[in-house]
Amino acid sequence: MASMAFTLVGAFKGMSLSSPCHSSSSASFLRADRVSLSVGGGVGMGVPMTMPVRRLTIQMAHKKGAGSTKNGRDSPGQRLGVKIYGDQVAKPGAIIIRQRGTRVYPGNNVGMGKDHTLFSLIDGLVKFEKYGPDKKKVSVYPYEKQPENPNSYRARKREYFRMQRERKKARAEGIVEVQLVLAAADESPEVNADC
C-alpha cells in the first residue's frame, strides 16, 4: 500500500549548547523546532505536515518542589519524645509520648492516636514496663493517695509553717496571744503546814 516516509528536519540540528542560528545557550531540542512529516505512497502524493515539538521543561508549582539538595536543612524539630515520665500523675487525655512509629506500645488505660501518640484514658500514675524481650509499653494505673505519716519531716514542716502563718495573722489583727504565766505560790499561814 502506501508507504510512510518520515523526515525529521531540524530535530537534531545544532545539538551543541551554542547554536549558530540562535543566540540562546540552550540546545535545539529544547526549543520548539518543527518536525516535518511526509505522508503518502507515490512520488507526488505526499502531503507535508509540520508539527511543533514540545519543550522538555520541568515545571513545578514552587521553587522548592524541584527537589533541591539544600532543602529541609533548617527545619524545626517535631517535638517528639516523652511528655509525662514514670510515676507522674496524668489526667485523662494527657499526651504521654509523641513518637514516629510504635517505639513504645500502649498498655493498660492508654490509647494510641493515628500518629502513634500515646495518651492517658484515666486519671492516674504513669508506669513504663517491659513488653517482651525488646519492647516497652506504658500504662496508667489509678492513683491511690497513701496516708501520710504525721511524724514525717514533711508533715512536721508543713505544720510548723501553718502555725507561723496563724501567729502572723493574729499579730496583724491585734489579737493578743495567750501566754502561760507562772504564778508563784504565796506562802500564807492558813495553808496547812503539814504538807
Swiss-Prot record:
Disulfide bonds: none
Transit peptide, residue positions per record: 1-60
Gene Ontology biological process terms from the UniProt entry: translation
InterPro entries associated with the record: Ribosomal_bL27, Ribosomal_bL27_CS
GO CC, one annotated term: chloroplast
Keyword Transit peptide: yes
Localization in the cell: Plastid, Chloroplast
A GO MF term: structural constituent of ribosome
Domain of life: Eukaryota
Keywords for the protein's UniProt record, in alphabetical order: Chloroplast, Plastid, Ribonucleoprotein, Ribosomal protein, Transit peptide
HAMAP family membership: Ribosomal_bL27
PANTHER family from the UniProt entry: LARGE RIBOSOMAL SUBUNIT PROTEIN BL27M, RIBOSOMAL PROTEIN L27
Subunit and interaction comment: Part of the 50S ribosomal subunit.
Protein family: Belongs to the bacterial ribosomal protein bL27 family.
Name of the protein described by the UniProt record: Large ribosomal subunit protein bL27c
Organism: Oryza sativa subsp. japonica
